[in-house]
Regions:
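A cross-kingdom marker for long, charged
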Residues: 141, 145-156
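Core of folded catalytic or high-affinity ligand/protein-binding domains
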Residues: 7-135, 139
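Charged, compositionally biased N-terminal leader segments and the immediate start
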Residues: 1-3
Length: 156
């Protein structure tokens, strides 16, 4: 019988094997308009570097907000809370966002309601969706995306 540590290590190895080719440069080679290609462009526009590996959070950020501004980062957390994703990290980011951007509370609440209206997607394996058109993914899960805003450079 596997111990919990062995199970975690097995899942980690599987994840590493599945994501080893998900650099921004490899992702932009996906067909035009697909989630994979748009994710690669998102990572390059955000100045994350050519060899950065895409992660689940990057895909969610792209699907929901299309940008990585501080306000949109916080709005994504509210969206995911509305979609049923809970966690201390998420709640901490939301509290910080409300304290730092109190004038955006109505926007955050709107995003929360959009998350409630969407089908549950926060725990979907996005690796299997990279070849699909991004608009189709959004339509399938009823994701109401924000219009893309200018991306901020990493570390700014």
């Amino acid at each position: 019988m596997e111990t919990m540590k062995e199970k975690i290590e097995k899942v980690r190895r599987e994840f590493d094997r599945n994501t080893q080719n998900l650099t921004a440069l490899n992702l932009i080679k996906y067909p035009e308009g697909t989630l994979g290609q748009q994710l690669g462009r998102f990572l390059l526009r955000a100045n994350y570097g050519q060899n950065v590996y895409a992660c689940h959070d990057d895909a969610l950020q792209l699907l929901i907000a299309g940008s990585n501004s501080f306000t949109d980062d916080i709005a994504v957390q509210f969206y995911l809370l509305g979609n049923g994703s809970y966690g201390l990290r998420r709640l901490t980011a939301m509290v910080a966002g409300v304290l730092l951007k109190p004038h955006k509370i109505a926007y955050f609440y709107q995003k929360y309601n959009h998350g409630k209206a969407a089908l549950r997607f926060y725990d979907v394996d996005h690796l299997g969706l990279l070849h699909l058109p991004i608009d189709r993914v959004r339509e399938t899960f009823m994701i109401q995306a924000s219009p893309p805003a200018p991306l901020r450079k990493r570390g700014v």
